[in-house]
């Protein structure tokens, strides 16, 4: 416990809040080739690699992911939610924040039903999260 005198000489530092999705808080000026501060809810990017990854213990699965080069030239790993997808290398995707707890290093989700990503087929409930259209009839 510091004394009052010690606190007067050197006050306490306030905690720095760290972003959960730092790549969304950076923009890029391509004319000046410089990164800027520009917070965005989503960002567009190009898939450079699409594959599967195994989760941490105690879970077991093959989780689908894509390595995405964003419009601000930062490369991130993003999770592809839902059953089945149509993504390939060079697909243009939209990413949002949101980590996947059992995949280390995955801090972003790909938005289904936006840009080149198709919505999940034959989905009846929770459709908006997976870009599925309303079934007819």
Curated annotation (Swiss-Prot):
Which CDD domains does this one have? Ribosomal_S12
Query: Its Gene Ontology molecular function terms?
Result: rRNA binding; structural constituent of ribosome; tRNA binding
Task: Provide the alphabetized UniProt keywords.
Answer: Methylation, Ribonucleoprotein, Ribosomal protein, RNA-binding, rRNA-binding, tRNA-binding
SUPFAM superfamilies named in the record: Nucleic acid-binding proteins
Q: Which residues carry this modification: 3-methylthioaspartic acid?
A: 102
One cellular component term (GO) for this entry is:
small ribosomal subunit
**Regions that span the bilayer:** none
The protein's matches in InterPro entries, at most eight in alphabetical order, are given as:
NA-bd_OB-fold (IPR012340), Ribosomal_uS12 (IPR006032), Ribosomal_uS12_bac (IPR005679)
One Gene Ontology BP term is: translation
Positions of region (Disordered): 1-21, 34-57
What's its job? With S4 and S5 plays an important role in translational accuracy.
Self-association and partners:
Part of the 30S ribosomal subunit. Contacts proteins S8 and S17. May interact with IF1 in the 30S initiation complex.
PANTHER family for this protein: 30S RIBOSOMAL PROTEIN S12 FAMILY MEMBER
Give the protein family: Belongs to the universal ribosomal protein uS12 family.
Q: What is this protein called?
A: Small ribosomal subunit protein uS12
Species this chain originates from: Streptococcus equi subsp. zooepidemicus (strain MGCS10565)
């Amino acid at each position: 416990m510091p004394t009052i005198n010690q606190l007067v000489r050197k006050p306490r530092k306030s905690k720095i809040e760290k972003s959960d999705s730092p790549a969304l808080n950076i923009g890029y000026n391509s004319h000046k080739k410089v990164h800027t501060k520009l917070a965005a809810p989503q960002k567009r990017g190009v898939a450079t690699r699409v594959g599967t990854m195994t989760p941490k213990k105690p879970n077991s699965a093959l989780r689908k992911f894509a390595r995405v080069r964003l419009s601000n030239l930062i490369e991130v790993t993003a999770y592809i939610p839902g059953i089945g997808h149509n993504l390939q290398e060079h697909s243009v995707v939209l990413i949002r924040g949101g980590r996947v707890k059992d995949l280390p290093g995955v801090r972003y989700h790909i938005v289904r039903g936006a840009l080149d990503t198709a919505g999940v087929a034959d989905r009846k409930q929770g459709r908006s999260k997976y870009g599925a259209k309303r079934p007819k009839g």
